[in-house]
UniProtKB/Swiss-Prot annotation:
Gene: APC6
Phenotype seen when the gene is deleted: Gametophytic lethal phenotype.
Protein name per its UniProtKB record: Anaphase-promoting complex subunit 6
Subunit structure: The APC/C is composed of at least 10 subunits.
Gene Ontology terms: biological process: cell division; phloem or xylem histogenesis; protein ubiquitination; regulation of DNA endoreduplication
Protein species of origin: Arabidopsis thaliana (Mouse-ear cress)
One GO CC term, this protein: nucleus
TPR repeat ranges per the UniProt record: 7-36, 39-64, 72-95, 128-159, 164-187, 194-232, 242-270, 277-304, 309-338, 343-371, 378-406, 411-443, 447-479, 484-513
């Protein structure tokens, strides 16, 4: 057969693959390989077999070829076949010997020399070495060697910043602390035209920077244009669903749950099967107590994705929201059974125990989550909260400090450190932690942070810094006028100052919120007696 005729059949194979006609592709690729015995045609046949899900046959074909030992493409495809067959040890053997350190630097196993993965700056294909590093990471992850998996994922993204999947695994499996994520991102060598990608990656990692910094990142990406003009409008990333899902996640971290919910709801109208956005939407609905939305989302997810952990996690969220914690726990457990690396279900499982004050089971679940997700500070933080609930304040403080080491920019960590210091009567330390909490809040203060402001006021009152205490109580009232603690604290501070008329006024406001509050009732009587003994304030008009 002439070369032109063979080339024509190669074209047929490529066309069959593009049209997903894999049996046809296998048929014609087999004939081309038989006619030429050329390595490229053998590789094309193996590709067709792989796409047609004939993994054993594809592996046998590649392994029988001597070139598999010399050509990285052959070795990588053979390893991909073993990945699909779940033969992870054999997959690692096929990929060859290499060592990696914690910085993601790869060394030759024989001579110990550093392997350089630099690629041509003009090359827009993913570096094959990066893909091999990523596959090694997946294999180690499947073998439960998360430390090696983390190192190989780092090696993959360092070998080629275009290998997004490696970064995705590092982020979603919480393998890195917030500082490690930032350090990794700053070490990546982006080409000049990939500046937008660097900005996008910076939006994907943990976002605890100040609002102005994060908003600037989003604004920069939203203004990124394609360089082409359609009609009179520029094409930008402003309405990209991935970018908007990142922004929704940021709103959730800032405790702006209503804003987050509205954005994710709009996104899911546009793209109802965007699963990352769906997860953020579920989290926002949980915080808002929107059980109807959780029910509808859970029903749709179970119908569309019955084999995904997210679907059963959504069912668990619904039951958790309506306070049926045993049922919630059952579905969180089902989600972790489907995907053991799905961190929200692991944490939700622990929370379902904590909600019923079953501390031992809750801490056991949190410890498992902390071991599996070393870059996520929430399990460690929740262990501290459980210890604090049982008045084991020193142990609680230790775990809060561990959480701070993992994520030093989350204001919630500093708030809990302040609370435990307050309980240990270390009021000066409590003031410092609460002030750090307010300093780390990325956006303007909202009602969610009102308890922190009140706690700071309480700590100042304990130090008898009444002026500062009153200032923060009044600041808390600008955030919420429904807090008994704020009114009673303000009343008591005025009472200590000898300002009985103001104290009486605020005790009344506190009792309006909770008429049977024993402390305010008793202190109101004391304040009235004190005012009688000191004479009626001339400024108070008697009716």
């Amino acid at each position: 057969m002439r070369e032109e005729e063979i080339e024509k059949i190669r074209g047929v194979v490529r066309d069959c693959v593009s049209k997903h006609l894999y049996s046809s592709a296998i048929f014609f690729a087999d004939k081309v390989a038989a006619l030429t015995n050329d390595p490229s045609d053998i590789y094309m046949q193996a590709q067709a077999l792989f796409l047609g899900r004939h993994y054993r046959r594809a592996f046998h074909l590649l392994n029988a070829s001597k070139i598999v030992l010399r050509d990285l493409r052959f070795r990588y495809l053979a390893a991909k076949c073993l990945e699909e067959l779940k033969e992870w040890d054999q997959c690692l053997l096929m990929l060859g010997d290499a060592k990696v350190d914690d910085d993601g630097i790869v060394y030759d196993a024989k001579d110990g020399n550093v392997i350089d993965f630099d690629k041509d700056g003009e090359d827009r294909e993913i570096n094959i070495s990066s893909a091999i590093c990523f596959l090694r990471g997946k294999a180690y992850g499947a073998l439960q060697n998360r430390s090696q998996a983390r190192q190989w994922y780092k090696a993959a993204i360092k070998a080629d910043p275009l290998c997004y999947e490696a970064l995705e695994c590092l982020i979603e499996s919480h393998m890195l602390t917030s500082e490690e994520e930032s350090s990794l991102l700053s070490s990546l060598q982006f080409s000049p035209e990939d500046g937008w990608l660097s900005s996008f990656y910076s939006c994907l990692i943990k976002k605890y920077d100040k609002e102005s910094t994060v908003e600037l990142k989003f604004k920069k990406l939203e203004n990124e244009t394609s360089g082409s003009v359609s009609g009179s409008s520029m094409i930008t990333l402003a309405n990209n669903t991935d970018l908007l899902a990142c922004k929704a996640e940021y709103y959730h971290q800032c405790c702006e749950y209503q804003k987050c919910f509205e954005l994710t709801a709009a996104l899911l109208e546009k793209d109802p099967f965007h699963l990352k956005c769906t997860l953020v939407h579920l989290a926002a609905a949980m915080e808002l107590g929107n059980s109807n939305e959780l029910y509808l989302m859970a029903c749709n997810l179970v119908k569309d994705y019955p084999s995904k952990a997210l679907s059963w996690f959504a069912v668990g969220c619904y039951y958790y929201c309506i306070k049926k914690y045993a049922e919630a726990r059952r579905y969180f457990s089902k989600a972790t059974g489907i995907d053991g690396s799905f961190s929200p279900a692991r944490i939700g499982y622990g929370n379902s125990f904590a909600a019923q004050e079953e501390g031992d089971q809750a801490m056991s679940a949190y410890r498992t989550a902390a071991r599996l997700f070393p870059g996520c500070h929430l399990p460690t933080l929740y262990i501290g909260m459980e210890y604090m609930r049982t008045h084991s304040y020193k142990l609680a403080d230790q775990f809060f400090m561990q959480a701070k080491a993992i994520c030093p920019s989350d204001p919630l960590v500093y708030n809990e450190l302040g609370v435990v210091a307050y309980h240990m009567k270390e009021y000066g330390k409590a003031v410092r932690w609460f002030e750090k909490t307010l300093a780390h809040i990325p956006s303007a203060l909202t009602e969610s942070w009102e308890p922190t402001v009140v706690n700071l006021a309480h700590a100042y009152r304990k130090l008898r810094k009444d002026r500062e205490a009153i200032s923060y109580y009044e600041r808390a009232l600008t955030l919420s006028t429904k807090s008994l603690s704020t009114y009673s604290g303000l009343a008591y501070t005025y009472h200590l100052q000898g300002n009985f008329s103001a104290a009486i006024s605020y005790y009344h406001k506190a009792l309006w919120l909770k008429p049977d509050d024993q402390f305010c009732t008793e202190m109101l009587n004391v304040a009235l007696m004190d005012e009688c003994q000191n004479g009626v304030d001339s400024k108070v008009e008697l009716c």
